[in-house]
Amino acid sequence: MRRVTVGVIGSGGIFQGAHLPGYSDVQEAKLVALCDVSEEVLKNAEKRTKKLYLERVENAKEDGKPELAEQLKGDAADIRTYKSAEEMLSKEDIDLADICTPTKFHNPLAVMALKSGSNVMVEKPMARTYLECLDVIEAVKDTGKLYQHNENWLYDPIWYNAKKFIESGIIGELQLVFVATAHGGPEWASWFWDPEIAGGGALLDNGVHAITASWYLNGFEKSPVAVKAAEPYGICIRMKTRLLQGMFKPFIVEDDAHVLIRYEGESGGWSTAHVEGSWSHRDSMETRMIGTNGEIQPHEDEKGVVLKIVDSFGSIREISLGKRTWTMSFGGEIRNMCNCVISGARPVCDENIGAETTAVVQAAYLSQKRGKRAVTLDEFKEYASTLREKEGKDAPKVLLKEMLGAIKVYA
């Protein structure tokens, strides 16, 4: 079996907590190098990686898989570390670069890795701004390499199985999707609250999951055509201060966002999604997919995940999907990209999906800026293009400032 050599750029939280468990379970991937600018983070990542791989060695032995045990043992011994992406990309024969840095560095590192001859996958969001996404799209075209926008929800049993039932026609034609992704906030990492680094708040962090998932459910053959910051909250700041770096501080990125998206297909069909991206817990409708003949409602408890399908007469069918773990979907995206590299197939969730998702986010900011008026994607892109012509290389920074300027404390 051919194995894909992988170098990780950014070895901190999302790599150690989510990607790393996936790598140890994906035989198609051979993790050869870790890179991080922080020596402390890098040492910890190396230690955790080798520890986990050696634990998997023992598991493989117990399962009667000596060849797998030897492979994992060799992988653990071979991992090398670097403090700069440039050095790693120049010294290693990397098939695939996995970029797990804060958002500000996504697009320059992706472009660098593509130009070095590596295929690339990048943790969501693709970049801080739509204009930065365009730089990556250009690099993909110039190099002919593959790019995967890492939206792990596509590999989660809830969304994957809901998509199956929607395509089967069991609820008729999909009309409306509610997708909420919310938690209490990432106070543990100061960079999330810095727009210069993060590019936005809860909408760009959590909300992109909901946006791409709602698009996936509707079908990537459709396109997002219009966006509206939804009443009453729109995109706003719900808490005036947060405990950041050990003390109460004000902040300027949104901690709550409610957005309406219209999707249209070439045949004239259309549907709507309401998405919430929040760091102040959910206050929108629970996730559900509503069709002309019924709806799908996902639920999860200690027994596992259940999809409840309710038809137009109120009859209920429950589909048990078993238990899931938080990290299993990350293994799915890693395996998918490795097999794309091996086969040469384009990832389903590619650079265009990533860029359009970012465009939806920024069109929502523009809608908020314009009093929550609906904004078409074409309208937003013309706005961004005009800024690019006027501001040149400073355009992404100006666009970022203008889009976030309308976010205020909700009162």
Which residue ranges define each predicted feature?
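Active-site loop of classical SDR/Rossmann-like NAD(P)-dependent oxidoreductases
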Residues: 14, 40, 323-334, 358
